[in-house]
């Protein structure tokens, strides 16, 4: 079970975007996340008439490692750690470590 999922509100812990908040838009693999508006870089794109794209400089989000982000707890207004709790019926749910409150699915 991934502790950080698509749609989660996160906060960046390290790097040039430290302190910024965003929403996870995709998981690139088991350890990298794509976050809207975070880790933006400028890429030079060649024009390609076959695809109908014009050339130029495009700004896009690049993946960031999940160890550099933490889930944002709206109740406390701070970054928090995620734990897994097994309920009585055997299902596993994600909870905030600080409060024990269940993390709502996005």
From Swiss-Prot:
Query: What Pfam families does its record include?
Result: KOW (PF00467), ribosomal_L24 (PF17136)
The alphabetical list of record keywords is: Ribonucleoprotein, Ribosomal protein, RNA-binding, rRNA-binding
Q: Please give the InterPro entries that the UniProt record associates with this protein.
A: KOW (IPR005824), Rib_uL2_dom2 (IPR014722), Ribosomal_uL24 (IPR003256), Ribosomal_uL24_CS (IPR005825), Ribosomal_uL24_KOW (IPR041988), Translation_prot_SH3-like_sf (IPR008991)
Q: Does the keyword rRNA-binding apply?
A: yes
Spell out the GO cellular component terms annotated for this protein, sorted alphabetically and separated by semicolons. Answer: ribonucleoprotein complex; ribosome
- Report the record's Gene Ontology biological process terms: translation
UniProt xrefs under CDD domains? KOW_RPL26
Q: What Gene3D superfamilies does this protein map onto?
A: 2.30.30.30
Give GO terms: molecular function aspect only. Answer: rRNA binding; structural constituent of ribosome
Q: Which family does it belong to?
A: Belongs to the universal ribosomal protein uL24 family.
Share what the entry says about its subunit structure, partners included. Part of the 50S ribosomal subunit.
Q: Outline what the protein does.
A: One of two assembly initiator proteins, it binds directly to the 5'-end of the 23S rRNA, where it nucleates assembly of the 50S subunit.
Name the record gives this protein: Large ribosomal subunit protein uL24
Give the organism, scientific name.
Delftia acidovorans (strain DSM 14801 / SPH-1)
Gene designation per UniProt: rplX
């Amino acid at each position: 079970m991934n502790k950080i999922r698509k749609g989660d509100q996160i906060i960046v812990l390290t790097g040039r975007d430290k302190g910024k908040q965003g929403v996870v838009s995709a998981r690139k693999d088991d350890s990298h996340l794509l976050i809207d508006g975070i880790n933006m870089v400028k890429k030079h794109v060649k024009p390609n008439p076959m695809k109908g794209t014009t050339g130029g400089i495009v700004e896009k989000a690049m993946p960031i490692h999940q160890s550099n982000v933490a889930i944002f707890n709206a109740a406390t207004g701070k970054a928090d750690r995620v734990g897994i709790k097994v309920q009585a019926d055997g299902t596993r749910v994600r909870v905030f470590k600080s409060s024990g409150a269940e993390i709502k699915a996005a």
